[in-house]
Amino acid sequence: MFPSLQSFAKKVLARQHVSIDYHVILERCGLWWYKAPISLDCKHMLIKLPSFADGLDLNTALMLATKENNYQLIKLFTEWGADINYGLICANTPPVRELCWELGAKYRVDKKKIMHMFFKLIHPGTTSSNIILCLKLFNDNPFSAYVIIREIKSSIYWKLKKLVEDTDVLSNISDGDMLTIYCFMVALQDNLREAISYVYQHFKYLNTWWLICALCFNKLFDLHNLYEKEKIRMDMDEMMRIACTKDNNFLTIYYCFILGANINLAMIASIRFYNMDNLFFCIDLGADAFEEAKALAEQRNYFLISHRLSLDIYSPDSSLLTLKEADPNKIYHLLKNYKSKNMTAYFNHDDTI
């Protein structure tokens, strides 16, 4: 699209450092967004705003402006070189779609562009800004959410299915909510606090999922915040089962144990998920369902586990049984240098005796 003289002048102005005394001029001429002046890094074609620390490339900025029905910025970013087909992805109303078509967009949304933008934002080592931006662009955007979820569904569905045994729960989640949960899982695993806080604030109706994710990813302090401060509740033994889905989840397993969850059920769950470190941790905490656990191991052909459970060498670790309250700081310090007493006993055992 050939830029107008007005958009060219704005582009020149956006490249300059403008004193705060003249911000009112920028606001009046349309170079104002998210309560701040729009500045342009022409070398990398990035829109710079305080709300987006990483900057926005023109296509991403166009998508956000389209999602917000900001006609002025849609035209401006397109004249500055953004691909209007990206804008069409986020056009949720007929007038905005008409504008995108007038500016040269194809009449069908390009699915490849949706996936390109999603993986550009959500990837290993991503930032809070990118996750928040992804949620702004694609949440409450039914077609885009549908396209993304169909592309990554095999990955995310099986991750969630492992956490929630009731498949009806999964079948009732909308594509948009599944996308939100996926983004939250990424943020939680990478400890992206700003993105985590954003999700807590804007998606409270999914709070049970935030509890599930905190249990699964061994996020003790998030779990405590959700359970104690936000008062999010679910069955205690189900919480323990979820904590046992990933190995070495000692912090969240212990938290559930202190709250009163059945440690023998945790022992059985650890075998079901084939998590041996969790199994020995449960034995350290006093689990003694050896016959049931051994039967399950044999049923699943886990013969090494069955052999381990048949040995009469195990006993609770009294040093782990001192806490009486679910204080995350005390739990963290108690387990900071944890090594399994019973796993050591197993490895030191001489089978020839």
From Swiss-Prot:
Entry GO CC: host cell membrane; membrane
Cellular compartment(s): Host membrane
GO biological process, one term: taxis
Database matches in Pfam families: ASFV_360
InterPro entries in the cross-refs: Ankyrin_rpt, Ankyrin_rpt-contain_sf, ASFV_MGF360
Glycosylated residues in this chain: 172, 342
Bilayer topology term: Multi-pass membrane protein
Record-stated family: Belongs to the asfivirus MGF 360 family.
Biological role: Plays a role in virus cell tropism, and may be required for efficient virus replication in macrophages.
Protein name in UniProt: Protein MGF 360-10L
